[in-house]
Amino acid sequence: AMYKALEDEYKFLQQALYLDSLPNAKGKVSPKYSKKIIQRIHDRHMSFWDAAVISYKNQDYKKAYEMWNTYLIIPEKYGISEEKKKQLEESGKVDSTYIFGRYYAALAAYISKDYELAIPALNRAKESDYDVLTIYQCLNELYTNQKDSANMFAISQEAVERMGINKDTENFLLQMINIYIAQDQINDAIAYLDKAIAANPRPEYYKVKGRLYEEVANEAEAMACFEKALELNPNMADVWSEMGRIYYNKAYEESQEINKIKDDKEYLKAREERIFPLYRKALPYYEKAYSIDPTNA
């Protein structure tokens, strides 16, 4: 209600401009008042910024978005005032308020939780270089809430390509990896994990990579990844346990084969030679896991 007069005046000015540009009785278009009307719109331009700021402070985020949006639309539709043009020419600067206007309009739309406003506004804001990390994070959150995995992936990939792989963009990279895993694209997931490791070699990444190699039955690579994880953090009980499980699973597979042996003597010999060594290999890993975390190991 506070800015109803400002909005109403803008509507009337637009209507007046439209009427002034209609052809006369002779079919000729000869605007009489357009210059004055546009000047009046220019005079009101900054008021929309002020209205946006006050609406934002009052937590009326939708109204703040609308006001900033009008602030951005006016120069697109009606150009900028002669006075403003002169100021910019003299200073030799670009008017950065439009960059900030797009940014704040996008944030206001995001906070309002109106996805239909927020997603296009955020996509417009990322065309500038101002605080793009926040813009990508907001977009990612909205796409995640909508369970839109195609756009989640696209926005994460764009963020990583634009800002490089670093601690700020790590979560985008992990999101891409998780989407690959969910879609059973294990090799792509491993390739992206390698990029994450190159940027920040965390033991957790090696652990995930080891599990992915297990998925594709590459136990040697899985063990190498788990060993690397433990080099970086020897207190990861679940990784010690995971390594024990690889040998335990091998023992189980061997026992399935050995159970087919009919001769008792042959069976006992095979068990001694093929299964027990694997259990003996698994045991120290489980013991280590238990010593670190007796509850969960």
Q: What do the PLM-derived regions correspond to, one by one?
A:
Residues 16, 71, 91, 125, ...:
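Canonical positions in the second alpha-helix
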Residues 19, 74, 128, 162-165, ...:
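Structural marker of alpha-solenoid helical repeat scaffolds
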Residues 51, 105, 139-142, 159, ...:
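Structural register within alpha-helical repeat arrays
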Residues 78, 98, 132, 166-169, ...:
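Residue-level recognition of tetratricopeptide repeat
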